[in-house]
A protein has these predicted regions:
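Non-globular, low-confidence helical/coil segments that flank catalytic cores
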Residues: 1-349
């Protein structure tokens, strides 16, 4: 009888534990706020009769209410996340958030959406994505999509492929993926990325430069059809390139690609990208290659890194620098490696 009662009690506990209303998430507050909250908790848990014991719980309020600083109107913040051999870039404006690509899936289990992107969204206090851009359907760019959709609602998506069809197919092929959208979560609106499509958010302009409307996939090459997005704020600009190659770069340059402060090096800095035309047209101050440590492709190619450096750009690479962050402000453009600015003991030295 006791075992039966225990089993029933555990059923109720498991049900409560899985309910959405049973827990909530808060943004990652600075350590002094956490220390203050822990001190208040220790005070509140003292024995009855301890002076002002219950007031200790009030010390937790700053931790629960803290929100990270957001950019001012016309400014933006970028996080080129460290997802290994793949791509995931978070762009924040004053009130909105955009994710460009969702990182790779790990065949040993898990994906970048679950392991990297969702925790970053939580740490930044982001409970909703206004825009999700999936540049193309390669798994190193879309492998974490279903985990992202399970973590936060997405108002609309842009992609160079049919996102709804891809999600259905992926659910059939990977039914056991954690957070895999068993409830069928999809973006509220799913659109194609097409050259000339543009919108504004908080004084920041987002414009697709590639592919052209109705353009067929070149030779069946998904890379060539990648969405290319330019982010233009009041002070600085950012170019997100997917996996386009030299041919598409030449097309962008011929169409009058404006100078750009930060460029995500196309195709992880492969030897078949970051051609002279793109490098010369962009005139970037910073180039970022998202690639995995000791990846089998040899990304980024040494010649590509030299090309950007010779053009005067600082060259960042996630296999060496980890996540690369940037903040565009009226006072200037601040770009840094998270690993260097906020070093942890588990980082190699």
């Amino acid at each position: 009888a006791g075992a039966r009662v225990f089993e029933l009690a555990m059923t109720v506990v498991a049900w409560v534990g899985n309910a959405e209303w049973a827990s909530f998430t808060v943004a990652a507050a600075p350590w002094p706020w956490l220390a203050w909250a822990l001190a208040g908790m220790a005070w509140a848990l003292q024995a009855p009769g301890w002076p002002a014991r219950r007031l200790g719980w009030l010390c937790m309020l700053p931790l629960l209410c803290w929100r990270p600083e957001r950019p001012a109107p016309g400014e933006w913040r970028m996080s080129a996340l460290d997802v290994g051999q793949g791509s995931a870039i978070l762009v924040e404006t004053a009130t909105q958030a955009l994710l460009f690509d969702a990182g790779p899936r790990h065949f040993g289990g898990g994906d970048a959406g679950e392991r990297v992107i969702a925790p970053q969204l939580q740490a930044r206090g982001i409970g909703r994505l206004d825009v999700l851009v999936l540049s193309h359907a390669d798994l190193d760019h879309v492998g974490g999509t279903r985990s992202v959709l399970a973590a936060v609602p997405v108002a609309r998506s842009y992609a160079s492929f049919d996102v709804a069809a891809w999600l259905r197919r992926d659910a059939r092929l990977w039914p056991g993926q954690d957070g895999a959208g068993a409830d069928g979560r999809t973006p509220a609106r799913m659109l194609r990325c097409e050259r000339g499509d543009s919108w504004q958010a908080d004084g920041v302009t987002f414009t697709f430069l590639h592919p052209a409307a109705g353009a067929p996939v070149a030779g069946g090459d998904r890379n060539a059809n990648s969405c290319v997005l330019r982010v233009g704020g009041a002070h600085h600009s950012l170019l997100l390139t997917g996996d386009i190659g030299v041919a598409q770069e030449r097309e962008l340059a011929a169409l009058g690609l404006p100078p750009t402060d930060i460029v995500l090096a196309p195709h992880h800095g492969s030897a078949w990208s970051s051609g002279r035309e793109l490098v010369a047209a962009a005139r970037a101050g910073h180039a970022i290659a998202q690639d995995g440590y000791l990846n089998r492709f040899g990304h980024p190619a040494p010649a590509v890194e030299r090309r950007w450096l010779r053009a005067g750009a600082a060259f960042w690479r996630s296999d060496r620098d980890g996540a690369v962050m940037a903040e565009s402000r009226a006072a200037g453009l601040d770009v840094w490696a998270q690993r260097a600015r906020h070093r942890r003991y588990w980082h190699g030295r």
